[in-house]
């Protein structure tokens, strides 16, 4: 049952662009992804696949962050890039895009996981970022060619964002934010989850404070992520995390 789909995938990739692919039985398939639930059998990519083997932090957060959230994201992405951590995001608008753009000012150690075909990009305003990362960085997807994005794929790619990371950082989120779905995947995969606290008077962005109450590791400085990296993950209660988009 696997081989026909693999053959079909090979035909797709041969008929498309310069994208490459690896499979679950290939020597260069990311070891971290082999450890997650339901790893993609075929992984398509543009760029430097060896980045998945380096120390890394997945950055997630609001699609429409506040000025505070934007500044926090820029600060942490900047400092982590200077520490040679690979920055990983799903390339969504907002926090994810801000983190990638800031990190690329320092380093080419950036990874984006797409919810669409490897030869496309999402959201559409990230065309220049996509093209830059294909040359300097890494773009990966479990979908071939220009397959259009679907609602369930937006959620599914978060398991890969978390899966290839060593830890997950949320810089700013709303209450019951859909970005909390990555927390569920991180817990399932045994990854540490870090959250930057928001102001108690900011009623629009209490999501991170809620995560901290549930057991996420609070960070108030970029160096906290490195200093606390050996702490075992806490038993977050993810029963309240909505897995539906």
Model-derived regions, located:
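Single conserved hydrophobic/aromatic residue that forms the stacking wall/gate
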Residues: 1-8, 12-13
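Glycine-biased, small-residue-rich flexible motifs in mid-sequence functional cores and linkers
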Residues: 20-245
């Amino acid at each position: 049952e696997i081989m026909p789909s693999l053959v079909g995938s090979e035909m797709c990739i041969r008929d498309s662009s310069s994208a490459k692919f690896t499979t679950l039985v290939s020597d260069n398939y990311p070891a971290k992804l082999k450890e997650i639930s339901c790893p993609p059998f075929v992984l398509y990519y543009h760029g430097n696949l060896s980045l998945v083997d380096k120390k890394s932090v997945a950055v997630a957060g609001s699609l429409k962050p506040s000025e505070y959230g934007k500044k926090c994201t820029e600060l942490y992405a900047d400092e982590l890039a200077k520490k040679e951590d690979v920055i990983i995001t799903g390339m969504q608008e907002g926090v994810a895009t801000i983190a990638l753009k800031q990190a690329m000012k320092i380093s080419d150690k950036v990874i984006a996981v797409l919810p669409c075909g490897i030869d496309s990009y999402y959201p559409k305003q990230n065309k220049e970022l996509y093209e830059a990362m294909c040359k300097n960085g890494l773009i990966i997807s479990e979908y071939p060619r220009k397959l259009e994005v679907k609602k369930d794929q937006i959620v599914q790619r978060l398991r890969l964002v978390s899966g290839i990371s060593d830890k997950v950082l949320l810089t700013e989120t709303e209450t019951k934010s859909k970005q909390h779905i990555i927390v569920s995947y991180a817990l399932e995969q045994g990854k540490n989850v870090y959250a930057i606290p928001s102001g108690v008077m900011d009623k629009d962005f209490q999501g991170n404070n809620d995560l901290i109450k549930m057991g996420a590791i609070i960070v108030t400085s970029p160096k906290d992520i490195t200093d606390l990296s050996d702490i075992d993950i806490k038993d977050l209660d993810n029963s309240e995390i909505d897995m539906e988009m």
